Amino acid sequence: MYTKFQQHLQKELADIEAAGLYKNERIIESPQGAEIMVKGKKCLNFCANNYLGLADNPELIAAAKKGMDARGFGMASVRFICGCQDLHKQLEKKIAEFFGTEDTILYAACFDANGGVFEPLLTEEDAIISDALNHASIIDGVRLCKAQRYRYANADMADLEEQLKAAQKNRFRIIVTDGVFSMDGNVCPLDKIYELANKYDAMVMVDESHSAGVVGKTGRGVTERYNLRGKIEILTGTLGKAFGGAMGGFTTGKKEIIDMLRQRSRPYLFSNSMAPGLVAAGIRMFELMSETKALQDNLH
């Protein structure tokens, strides 16, 4: 059986390579940074999401080491069995304070956060209205949910309004958008989205993965840029880009939403907790963000 499947895969891979789409991994022989070593040569690095240069920050490295010394290397458990340390609750509180939200839930990655947010909250009676250029993790999360799907052209508010009109027959409606679209760097028009959400009785979800730490006067993301802190129902994001570039994702927002995700979000329920060292470094990172906006000033 595998011989036929092998031949099929070989042809598919050959087609990918012939189209110039085959992905080769670049092997880095140094810490992540503005300068990296590749094949023994020092190179300028313009392709990482290390927006604030924190991936090799000495304070975060020290915090991670201290966290491992104090709380161990790993958790070997999901959160609700025996995988929740005081560090995890501290980081969740720090994230909520940073974004001006009510509560936070941690995930292994933002892909998990986006993949696990819709199905626990919405049913076939409800509607998801999603930007056409949203991240793949949002697209996959929507596919896993039974809610009716509507799509509007990228940042096209006229099209969004038409989709909202069409979704008025549904029980609950949620508009979903990237804060910053990763492929072109455009910022979503969240002020206009929020106005339409109020007009058509819809909730809003924003993925702040590429905007948190970067957009806004103090790096609080697009909600800060548009003076909408605390007014958006759901925010998702990652610790894997501007916030140090390691691992970890989160959903932060209204308390009841976070409570329901703790009960029913499958990536949260069935994945190991974040490692203590990463959590400790995340706590220190948010402390740095609260102490100064020098990183943002240097970036801009």
What are the residue ranges of the model-derived segments?
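N-terminal "arm"/small-domain region of PLP-dependent enzymes with the aminotransferase-like
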Residues: 10-11, 15-73, 202
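Short loop-beta-helix segment that forms the pyridoxal 5′-phosphate
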Residues: 78-84, 93-116
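Conserved PLP-anchoring active-site segment centered on the Schiff-base-forming lysine
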Residues: 117-136
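Short, structured coil segments at secondary-structure junctions
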Residues: 124, 144-146, 200, 231
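Active-site phosphate-binding strand-loop segment of PLP-dependent enzymes
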Residues: 150, 154-206
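Active-site PLP attachment segment
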Residues: 218, 224-260
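Structural signature of PLP-dependent enzymes
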Residues: 285-300
